[in-house]
Amino acid sequence: MVLCLATACTAIGSVGYAQDSGSENKVTMADKTIHAQPSYVLSNSQVELAVTLLGGHMAPVTFYRDTSEPIQPYHISPWQEEKGPEMPAAVLVPLRGDFFCMPFGGNSEALGSEKHPPHGEVASSHWIRKVTERAGSVSHTSMTLETTARVGKVTKDIYLVDNQNVVYTKHTIEGFEGKVPLGHHATLAMSEQENSVHLASSPIRFGMTYPGVFSDPKQGEYQSLEPGKHWDSLAHVPVAWKGQKDADLSRLPARQGHADLVQIYNQPADAHQTPAWMTATFTDKGYVWFSLKDPSVLNSTVFWIENRGRHGYPWLGRNHCLGLEDVTAYFADGLKASVEPNAINQQGIKTALELTKKTPTEIRYIQGVVRVPQAFQVVKTIDFSPGQITLVSPDGLRVSAPVNHAFLSTGNPVRSN
């Protein structure tokens, strides 16, 4: 099995927002326990988010919290309140929402003497909050984690801006040397209504189904897509059964009882450095979830399409979610497969980033939610203007929202005049 993992709250203490002056290995006090996980909380009038101390998983996130119909788009794994056997991987303990992965993937094979847990220590070790603060229109929290499998330090900065239903995230990687696959593991809660979630992305080079066995029947897992197939459109992806029509991955959920993995590769950035984007339009709920990224940093999106297709522990045939995971990686195979020659990097497409001790690397990422009218069924394109994005449907409907997308190049969540 390839491991791609792809609100009741109980207060356990209210911490002040002073910096932690103790050891890097000290676990700071959480604000709340949320779905069984001690969590840090950041909020403003529009958005409230929680980040687990264990693994830095971000969920729940409540957008439009100042309205009568708030939106919580992220998945919380169904075993969070349960007591049971030890999890087969540490990342499964807090599994929820969006989390940073490095090295991204299962990491089942060591690279020389270097061995990492699934999705890396950053997805399953304790993050130490350093500060939560508010300056002007920006609410900000910062936390750090020191790694040992490959020695270094990662700082997670999360920003909320007043009057925006947007989360800005920056991960600063210091002290690391060499190539590594990395990225964000955004995991959305799926609707029960079949074909109600409509997916669209900025232009791609191509897409590919995972070339091996992603869901192994010997382990009570089942997949529906034919392995190792290239394709040009999410709407036409070959299935595993001969004589059957292609799957339309732009319309989900579908094919209940299966778990599949595919990857799409973004076109390189244009001369205007326009962000690459991914969208999921929840037509039954009236909103679009979106992500924005620099395609020269995160050049692909892995789709973890989980529709109750795994029956081993802790899945038990009940997990229903959609991972839209913006990464530079070779599927979810981890460090060794991503840095060595593979079917993707041999085509000139990077499957790992080169890190250096001399210069910190910043991974900047934007996620958010936009309410849309019922007639808005899917995103055809996104128009970018200073401090704003406009979602455009195939019918010409236009919905705008304030988003400081220049953050991807500047690292500043506030638009500069």
Outline where the language-model segments fall:
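Bacterial N-terminal signal peptides
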Residues: V2-I12
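Surface-exposed acidic/polar loop and edge beta-strand patches at domain peripheries
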Residues: A18-Y168, K179-N417
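Asparagine-centered strand-capping/turn motif at beta-strand->loop junctions
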Residues: T172-F176
